[in-house]
């Protein structure tokens, strides 16, 4: 392990992380068997023209390369034995899970606001079973992956994520997906407060809104909540001799 990697990466059995990933603000080390790759909300809603974000006025024109880099990160993770967790954000077709007027989600969700302005969109945006809710065609879960629905921005809220991670001895969460400044950051922050180490692969994420929001979210994460790296560094770190070494 790189001498500059955080000391917190010594697990209770005394092992150091076998993988050292170049990152900001410093290199970060982890063990593949104690790590998951989280793919946040790579649904048509967030990454495809004609999906919710596009219809709500957000620019999704740059998501193609992000999808390609997520596919690379997923392939690298699988090859290294890192489990992949997929999130899909949304609600039942009647939007009971969205919370109703008594929930701030009803007032702040741009999907719900778009449907109130355009009633013809009702039961089409982020509704389970719809094209909008589905993952993009280029990203497909495989047997052994974990696929979880989530009703709010954070993947920890009202989901079994925490218990599933703890049961598997997971300590490190590597994030990709959309939107960096909303669901990615919300989930990473909640993980930080549950003692998980969070890493974002910046070029495998995309913001909702202007580019300044991407920069701000990444700066916030690297300063206060985690580490920021990229897909090429992730691939290289996982393919190193030490990372491939089977623990005794």
Swiss-Prot record:
Molecular function via GO: hydrolase activity, acting on carbon-nitrogen (but not peptide) bonds, in linear amides
GO biological process: one example: uracil catabolic process
Catalytic residues (positions): 41, 150, 183
Disulphide-bridged cysteine pairs: none
InterPro entries: Isochorismatase-like_dom (IPR000868), Isochorismatase-like_hydrls (IPR050272), Isochorismatase-like_sf (IPR036380), RutB (IPR019916)
Domain of life, source organism: Bacteria
Catalyses which reaction(s): (Z)-3-ureidoacrylate + H2O + H(+) = (Z)-3-aminoacrylate + NH4(+) + CO2; (Z)-3-ureidoacrylate + H2O = (Z)-3-aminoacrylate + carbamate + H(+); (Z)-2-methylureidoacrylate + H2O + H(+) = (Z)-2-methylaminoacrylate + NH4(+) + CO2
UniProt entry keywords in alphabetical sequence: Hydrolase
Catalytic activity, EC: 3.5.1.110
Annotated HAMAP family: RutB
Family: Belongs to the isochorismatase family. RutB subfamily.
Function: Hydrolyzes ureidoacrylate to form aminoacrylate and carbamate. The carbamate hydrolyzes spontaneously, thereby releasing one of the nitrogen atoms of the pyrimidine ring as ammonia and one of its carbon atoms as CO2.
Protein name, UniProt field: Ureidoacrylate amidohydrolase RutB
Organism: Methylorubrum extorquens (strain ATCC 14718 / DSM 1338 / JCM 2805 / NCIMB 9133 / AM1)
